[in-house]
Structures are given as structure tokens and as C-alpha cells.
Design a protein with these regions (language model features):
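Catalytic alpha/beta active-site cores
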Residues: 1-178, 193-196, 200-204
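Conserved, mostly hydrophobic/aromatic
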Residues: 186
Length: 205
């Protein structure tokens, strides 16, 4: 109900709406609240337009539509929580399983316009890392998620497009090339090591 009140007046399934949630440890719970709110908005619209409750098949169609259309990002980067913020609510293994559960849900329900994780170097830099260390740890975290999701049987070309990245910036000269270097390393690894398709080569930040 709180999430519904928060987004009252916003069409969460509009192409012009994208919601970014900077939440990590509680990400699965908050994301579930958000996605259910988007679904409920579609059901409420159906009631208003048709003057009745949707049937089970209609409700399923509305649910599938909302999940396929809704846009946004949930940070949910548990590894940088441990490395840069020391705020890991759960064990690393358990947190990785929860992140995998989120991505598995996205795959199963064709959630293609929502980033399931924003792999974040910014916080690592704020904790004292120089640009090179920030980049190295952030990419390592990204590859860790790739390996974890592959181990669960997910297709790399289905889940990697749900990844985004987040880096800091500054006056150090390395920052002038960090984005290009990150994209190069990611693309080469996706192509040469993982055999992924061209869409997975794109590091988005």
C-alpha cells in the first residue's frame, strides 16, 4: 500500500517512465513491492475501463504485459556493499542466491527493460580506491555475477542485457579513459571467453 501511495499518479508502464532504486540488501523485497505496484496499476486501469474485475486469463495477460514493459534499475550490487560500504545485510553466498533469484525471475517473465543490477564502482572509489582499482573490482564483480548466473543454467545473452554499470569520476588522468577501457575489456571477455552475442558485448553506464 505504501508503494502504491508513493507512485500514485505515475504510470509505471509508460515508455516515458523509468524508476531507479538505489537499494541493495533489501532489493528483492523493494523490487517485489514495485513490480506488484506496476501490475496492480494495469489491473486498476482494466477495472476503470471495463467496469468489472478481470478474469483469470485477463489478469495473467495484464501481469505479463506490465512485467515486459516496466522500465527501471535496481542497484542490488551486494559485492560492492561488502567492498565499499561494509553494509552487507546477509552473507555473500546468500545474497548472491537472492540476486540470482531476481535474475531468474526476470528471465522467466521476460522482464527485458529493467536492469536487475547496477554494478557499482562509485562506492568502491568513495571508500578509497584509485581509478584503476575501482575499475578492476567493478569488472571482477560483474564477471562474478556472470559466473553465478551461468552456474544456475541461465543463458548469458538473456541475462547480461539486464546488467548496468556505475562508475565515479574525478580529476585523476585515468578517469579520461576508464569508460573506454571498461567497455573494451567487457566486450572482449564477452566475445572471446564467453562466446556471447553482440548485445551482451555492450557495457552500459
Amino acid at each position: 500500500d505504501d508503494m502504491k501511495a508513493l507512485y500514485a499518479g505515475f504510470d509505471l508502464c509508460s515508455p516515458q517512465t523509468s524508476v531507479s532504486m538505489t537499494i541493495n540488501g533489501p532489493a528483492p523485497t523493494v523490487l517485489a513491492f514495485f513490480l506488484n505496484t506496476a501490475i496492480d496499476q494495469q489491473i486498476d486501469r482494466f477495472r476503470e475501463e471495463n467496469g468489472r474485475e478481470p478474469e483469470a486469463s485477463e489478469r495473467a495477460t495484464l501481469r505479463a504485459y506490465a512485467l515486459e514493459i516496466v522500465r527501471g534499475t535496481v542497484q542490488a550490487d551486494i559485492l560492492k556493499e561488502d567492498q565499499g560500504q561494509n553494509t552487507c545485510l546477509f552473507s555473500t553466498d546468500f545474497s548472491l542466491r537472492m540476486m540470482g533469484d531476481i535474475q531468474q525471475y526476470f528471465v522467466a517473465h521476460n522482464v527485458r527493460n529493467f536492469y536487475s543490477v547496477s554494478i557499482s564502482g562509485y562506492h568502491i572509489a568513495e571508500a578509497g580506491a584509485n581509478p584503476i582499482t575501482q575499475l578492476a573490482l567493478t569488472l571482477a564483480n560483474g564477471f562474478t555475477y556472470v559466473e553465478a548466473y551461468l552456474a544456475r543454467g541461465m543463458d548469458i545473452d538473456v541475462f547480461v542485457p539486464n546488467f548496468s554499470f556505475f562508475f565515479s569520476n574525478g580529476m585523476d588522468p585515468e578517469y579520461t579513459v576508464m569508460g573506454r577501457v571498461a567497455r573494451r575489456i567487457w566486450a572482449v571477455a564477452m566475445r572471446e571467453f564467453y562466446g556471447a552475442g553482440s548485445r551482451s558485448h555492450k557495457l552500459k553506464y
